[in-house]
Regions:
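Arg/Lys-rich, glycine/proline-spaced intrinsically disordered segments
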Residues: 47-52, 260-269, 332, 337
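Polybasic low-complexity intrinsically disordered regions
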Residues: 79-82, 92, 100-251, 258
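Helix-centered, glycine/charged polyanion-binding patches within enzymatic domains
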Residues: 161-163, 236-237, 242-314
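Trp/Phe/Arg-rich N-terminal binding region typifying the photolyase-homology
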Residues: 46-57, 71-110
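Charged, often Cys/His-bearing segments associated with DNA-binding zinc-finger transcription factors
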Residues: 1-34, 40, 328-337
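C-terminal domain-tail junction helix/linker
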Residues: 157, 306-309, 315-317, 323, ...
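Basic, short loop/linker segments at the boundary and entry of helix-turn-helix/winged-helix-like folds
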Residues: 24-65, 69, 104
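Secondary-structure capping and boundary motifs in well-ordered enzyme cores
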Residues: 15, 51-59, 97-100, 277, ...
């Protein structure tokens, strides 16, 4: 078998493009716009110029985007970059370049997490979407979805202690055991389904289906908890399901929250029809969560703790927006549909 030549690599990449390499759609992203925030979050003066130079921060950020797009572990990410020429092209790597190993990927993500960088990176991209007129603010949809975390095998007593905001005494005496325990995640039940982990509260632009804001909480927090924090003077109309009834809506914002029926006071036919009309728009946020669950291979966590959950869920929302942006730009002028 002959060696893989430069011409062979070029031919293979050309063929991948013909077959439809979905990662090429993300070339439209201005990756360099993230560099200032990435450098600020990772800036650390090198003690010596000896040894290998550090990896480029934008390339490492693109590794995290790849990882979230395909929902890969650190080890799987390292392997897939080495194995898949489409991944290498997306990262700007050749067969002769070093590939970040699993530990490097973990350390980079951990550094960004500790710096609280994901909120700024999300906002950075959001500003670009605003500037390009993709976020219209004509309609705003608010909803929340569960994000399951690795289930903990705790005793009932330990769970009660955690629920009270305390750490079981036995865990405090064993730091290694405590490091493997998630004291921030919570159990919750909805529609006969039980979940353990966190919630992604999202605010979505109705026209573009872009996420304009989000908040991360533990799973037991009510869906409507972040509602009032999301709304501002830019919003014209707000849509939400009946779980959000009774929440304060700023003056000037049209209330299109679905009405709720009560015992002894069911909804009238007119109210039911009104809810059906509102739901035609409100359902667009389900398309967002559906894309993440399907095209982005699931909305789950491998991490432990609220800080890592905030980073990973924030990254999920950012990567979704990148994918949605590439779709909108291919469609041309923005239309509702």
């Amino acid at each position: 078998m002959g060696q893989f030549s430069l011409f062979g690599e070029v031919d293979r990449l050309a063929r991948l493009s013909q077959l439809g390499d979905c990662l090429e759609r993300l070339k439209i992203i201005n990756w360099e716009s993230f560099r200032p925030e990435l450098q600020a979050a990772t800036s650390k003066e090198r003690k010596s110029k000896a040894g290998r130079p550090p990896y480029d921060v934008v390339m490492l950020f693109k590794v995290l985007v790849l990882q979230r797009l395909y929902n890969l572990s650190d080890d799987q990410t390292e392997y897939q970059i080495n194995d898949r020429i489409s991944f290498m092209r997306f990262l700007g790597l050749t067969l002769n370049d070093r590939v970040p190993d699993a530990k490097t990927i973990w350390l980079f993500r951990d550094t960004l997490t500790k710096a609280g960088a994901i909120e700024r990176l999300f906002a950075c991209f959001g500003e670009q979407l605003e500037t390009q007129g993709l976020i219209t603010h004509k309609g705003t949809i608010v909803d929340a979805t569960f994000v399951d975390a690795p289930k903990q095998r705790n005793t009932r007593k330990e769970n009660e202690t955690i629920k009270n905001g305390e750490v079981p005494e036995e865990w405090s005496d064993h730091p290694h055991k405590l490091a493997q325990k998630d004291t921030d995640a919570r159990w919750a039940k909805k529609n006969q389904e039980t979940h353990y982990g966190y919630k992604d509260h999202a605010k979505v632009d109705a026209d573009s289906k872009l996420i304009t804001d989000y908040a991360v909480t533990s799973a037991e927090v009510h869906d409507s908890n972040e509602f009032e924090n999301f709304l501002n003077e830019k919003d014209q109309v707000v849509y939400a399901d009946s779980a959000y009834v009774g929440k304060t809506i700023p003056q000037g914002v049209e209330n299109c929250v679905n009405e709720k029926g009560y015992k002894g006071k069911p909804l009238t036919e007119a109210q039911k029809e009104s809810n059906r009309q509102k739901s035609k728009t409100r359902a667009r946020i389900e398309h967002v969560f559906g894309f993440i669950t399907g095209s982005m291979h699931g909305l789950t966590l491998r991490s432990i703790g609220i800080n890592r959950a905030r980073f990973n869920i924030g990254l999920t929302n950012l990567v979704y927006n990148m994918c949605r942006y590439s779709i909108l730009k291919r469609k041309g002028p923005l239309t509702t549909g």
